[in-house]
């Protein structure tokens, strides 16, 4: 009240692929301590729906954390920038992910066909069947735009139109 501001929601972070400098045990301990004081959990960006869903299942089962999850999704951006950012923030093995998308030949076709831009279609569509599943309690998507707001907004608008 002294600040004249109210905080309706307070989030804590989660790392579906772990953290490059913090052990999983430490992450688990701190999540369990903070969860009772939070209203949602926001994840670090991750590129793989299965990794995210498995992680959510683990925090539900092993840590008894049932907060709604805002899933961190990388926005639309040039692959080179995406690789650079992913390395900086320590997210998985970025190159492996980008090549794993569908194998190296399909990756090259996708890279050329996309004009060198990553879009999170596969990730979002991989999560979509679980949006209404109470076990996962997906509260929404948190788009990491990395200053690529117009491209990401255009993608978002197209994705919504496609699925209406």
List PLM regions with ranges:
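Short, surface-exposed basic-aromatic patches at helix termini and helix-loop junctions that form
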Residues: 32-36, 56-64, 157-163
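Catalytic beta/alpha-barrel core
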Residues: 39-49, 114-115, 142-144
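Active-site pocket-lining/capping segments in soluble small-molecule metabolic enzymes
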Residues: 1-20, 62-132, 147, 159-164
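Active-site-adjacent beta->alpha loops and helix N-cap segments on the catalytic face
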Residues: 1-2, 21-25, 45-61, 148-158
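Conserved, mostly hydrophobic/aromatic
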Residues: 34-37, 71, 141
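Flexible, glycine/charged-enriched surface loops at secondary-structure junctions
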Residues: 133-140
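Active-site glycine-rich loop that binds ribose-phosphate moieties when present
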Residues: 21-36
